[in-house]
Structure formats: structure tokens, C-alpha cells
Amino acid sequence: MLCISVAPVSRKLSKADLLNAAGQCDLIELCLDHFLKEPDVGDILQGIPKPILVACRRPQDGGKFAGTEEERMTLLRQAIVAGPQYVELDLETAPKVPRFGKTKRLISVMSLDGPPDDVDAVYDEAAKVNADVIKFAWPAPTFEAVWPLLKIISQKRQIPTVGLAVGRGAVTLALIGRALEVPWSYAALERGLESVPGQPTVSDLKDIYCWDDINSKTRFVGLVGPVDRQTAITARALNAAFRKLDDRHRCLPLPIQSFDRLGERLERLKINAVLVAPELARAAAEHAEKREGSAESSGCADLLIHQQDGWTAYQKLWRHAAKVLEDRLGRKDEHDHPLDRRNVLVIGCGGLAQAFIHGVQRNKGIVSVTAANEKGAQQLAQKFNVRHVPFHNLYDTLADVIVIAEPSIQMGHGKADINAGYFRTTMAVMDLSAMPDDTPILAEARARGCKVVEPSDVFRAVLAAQFESLTGKQFPATVWDDVLANEP
């Protein structure tokens, strides 16, 4: 089930929010601690066609209630008399609030310092205060912090258990919980109405991650990296393609802290493939048991696939980004290589730069590398035996192709910025740092008459190659245009 958290500040807003949520979920959590004035819960609940879970949390539990503890207890008792399906009680409050009517008791264990030392002991304590459902919640900014919550909600216990991840791991927990068929997972009604930081909205879960499609037979494809706009677009596009081909795979964001023990945990979740964000490409290649040719030679990986002999790393970006660039340079056929003997300046020293340098070299381009991080650029130049250009000498260095491969590079006049005057009409410019989105650098390059390689074209080409590796099928041609048309 899906539980939408509603945290209104006024009685007038609460009615509208509850009715809005009712059409999109199975259970509604009404957070009384956000009200500016004491609400009439009985009146608010009248006419709401979905079961209600009432909560009124203390600040130490992540709530907003500003009154005294006695006032909070009074409000909870009044709420129970109104007859909601559930009332949330913390371990300290529960013994003071007797069971009343048909309202079930959700005993909440919020631990702002992380998982309790003894989960079983806490579970037993919650059972003693007449819990019908037990909720465990703690900060979970990473997949590693989500993992103990996953272990708890996946265990078969006498009393049903739900979990709430506070932070970026909330989407991950909600989606896996859906596949595990836990009693419910939490979502916010819309952006700005989250009951806890990092809570996904109902549209995030349904429109991006295909909540309604997920069940015990779903096979997840991990998206390793930050839970950001690029991850959302990747998930939306891949999920649309999976759905169009009637494939049971769906995307799962994995905001990891490191690759340590990741493979073991993925195997326990029966996840056999992950796409890797550019900033983690080098670490992904290092942690794989095997590296396919380009992943070995570039030292980067954007795709990991689990096989019988372990995890194998693949690098898809170099080939397809280089192909899109050469198409923009006027490639005539598959035997023509416009990069041959062209001077290509790569700006950046991270995983994107490393992968692309490998691609340019494979296409016989002449590579130079520069970055505001001089040490990183020097090391990259040594690794690939290419020319290093000190960043302060950038404006004395002319090139046929400029490739931005570092998100920190901006237009401007600072020491680590690029001045617009650098661009010439003879240049081709490619910015990989914010794919598939456009950037101010590309806008300036267009205005100055440069040949611009569209980042959405590169993103689509790489994503299509990854999709084919995952499924053995071609990426549906119409999906990408549909996804871009619906992006804000």
C-alpha cells in the first residue's frame, strides 16, 4: 500500500489536501504537529473516503509540535475519539494512551542517531504497549543507512513492520518495500509538503519509478549515484522502455557511500545490473571482479552486470559519445573518422574526462587535458600519455574540439571559470557535465557560432546502449522524445 503524508498548517488546507491525497493512495497520514492552531480532527476527517493514520510528533522525533507534552497528549486522545484507522504513538506516549474503539495503534520508533543497538529488544518493547503495527525510522542519506531498515521490514514477524527512511534513501526503501509487499510505504503529496526530509512525492514514485507496476516479480536495475535530476530522467526513460516492451525490470536509485559490500547486498536483493553515475565510474571499475576491454583500458565503468563469475564492468560512454561527436563533425559513413588528427581539449579530470579521453584516442584524435585541479589533470595526462595544459594557459591553447567533462566548470571570469571569449566559430563544443540538460556554456558556444553537440543526443545514445546490454533489445525509438516532452 501507499501512504501519503499530509502535513497542513491550517484546517482549510487540510481538507483540500486530504481529498487530493485520497485519490492517489491507500492510506493517508495526517500530521497534526504542523497545524498552527489546534485542529478539530473529527470535523477534518468527515467525508474523507480513505483510511486515516493520525500522527502528532515531538521535535525529538522529527516533528513540529510546539506545545507542551500535556497538550500533545490531549490532541492525540481527541484524535482517537474521531475514529481514524490508525494513531501513531511513540514508545513513551503509548503506555499513557489506552486503546479506544476500532483505532489501531502504530508504535513509532524514531532514532535520529541511526539504528537502535538492539532492534529485537525495541520490537519487544513496542509489542508490550499493544502495537498493531511497528514503524522504525532513522536518517538514511545512503543505501548503507537504508540497509538495516530493509533487513527489518523484510523479516517475517508476528506484528507487521513498516520503515521510514529520512533522507535520500527514502525512495530506495519505498520501492523495495513495495516489492516485498510490506504493509505500506510513505510518500508526500507534493514537493514542499514532505513530513520528513528527503521524502519522495507520490508523483516521484508513480511517474518516475512506476510504483503501480512493482510487485514481488519485479527485477530491479540499480542506478548507482546521487538521487538527482539525471537519475530521475534515466529512470523515467528506462522504465518507459521496459514498460513498452513488457519487460518486468524497473529502476531503483542507489545513493551509495562506497562500493564496499555493494555486490553482496545487490545479490541478496536479486539485482543483477547497475548503471553507474560518472563521478563513481572509476570506483566502479576498481571494485568489479572483471573489466570488459574498454572498462579495463579506460579505468572507468558506467555499467556493472553480475554473471556467474562475479561482477563485470563495462564502459559504454566513450564509444557512443565519440560517435555522436563525429556525426556532428560530419561523418560520412562508418569508416569515416572526423576525429582523426583533430586537436581535442578535454576540460576535467574525473570519470567523464577519463572515459572520453579513451574514446578520442581510440578514434585517433590528438588529446590535451586541463582542469582547475592541476594535480588531477597532470595525473590523467600521465595515465593516457597525452598533453597536459595548465588551466591558466587555457586561453593560449586552440583546439578543434572542446569537451567539458567537469560539473564545476562554469562561465565567468574567475580562476576556475571559462571566459566566453575563448570560443571560436571554428570550434566544436561538447558539454557532458549535465547530460541531458543544456548548460550556459553551450548556450554561449551557440551564440558565438560554434558547432554544438547536443547533450541530449549523447545521453540518449549511451542510455540506448546500456538498455541493449540489459535486455538484448533495442531501445524503443519513440520513448526518448516522449520522456523529454514531459520533463519540466
Report the location of each language-model feature.
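Glycine/small-residue-rich loop that forms an oxyanion/phosphate-binding "nest" at active or ligand-binding sites
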Residues: 52-96, 283-336
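Catalytic alpha/beta core domains of metabolic enzymes, predominantly
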Residues: 92-220
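Adenosine-phosphate binding glycine-rich loop
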Residues: 329-331, 428, 432-488
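Glycine-rich adenosine-cofactor-binding loop
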Residues: 165, 221-228, 313-318, 325, ...
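Short, conserved loop/helix-junction motifs that constitute active-site signature segments
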Residues: 46-47, 99-101, 338-339, 361, ...
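Active-site beta->alpha loop and helix N-cap motifs at the rims of alpha/beta catalytic domains
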Residues: 1-118, 125, 131, 138
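Rossmann-like adenosine-cofactor binding region
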Residues: 382-457
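Phosphate/diphosphate ligand-binding glycine-rich loop within oxidoreductases
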Residues: 218-331, 436, 442-444
